[in-house]
Amino acid sequence: QRYVPSINDAWVGTLTKIDNEAEPDAIINSWWDFGHWFKYWADRKVTFDGASQNKQQAHWIGKTLLTEDEDQAIAILRMLDCGGTKAEAEIYSIVKDTQKSVEITYKILSLSKDDARKELLKITNESHTKEILEYFYCEPPENYYITSGDMVGKSGVWAHFGSWNFERAKIYQYYKGNDVISFVESLKSELNYEDKEAQKLYYELSALSTDR
């Protein structure tokens, strides 16, 4: 069988240039597909690659590709470069709920360091707050953000992860494991839904399940 490699001189030249010119602790951010190339030819760390998709990197990088808010994208990249997914993981260790931890993470990303500190002190102590802030607001290493033409055809994939709605996922988990009464109570207490709104959603989900 004939085999045409995906790597080419353009890629090698670009990545070799990064290897020659980038700071030793520089990080390359991109979609995961070519992460192993980046590590080999550029000899730098990457956000994630084919061997490191066990956390939420796909959501955060997907979001940077999707968002029209440049400040949000920069804040996400700083967070990833400062500590990978440790910021959200530490918040999760406090609230024990993925939807809540991601929601808080997005809120922190939109705040100044001083305001973020105040927000974190609502849920944890001073020393833990200081640790978490470092994962959001360290002096980040040099950052290379790589996009390539093939990513246009892959947009359905990174957009799927980047636009993942954690609240909807949580609602579906409640639906799968509860009857209508428990479902409604969960949405009221956890997500501030009204009775009628929660009941309507339950029966909409039931109809979808039946249609399948």
Predicted regions and their residues:
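Extracytoplasmic
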Residues: 1-212
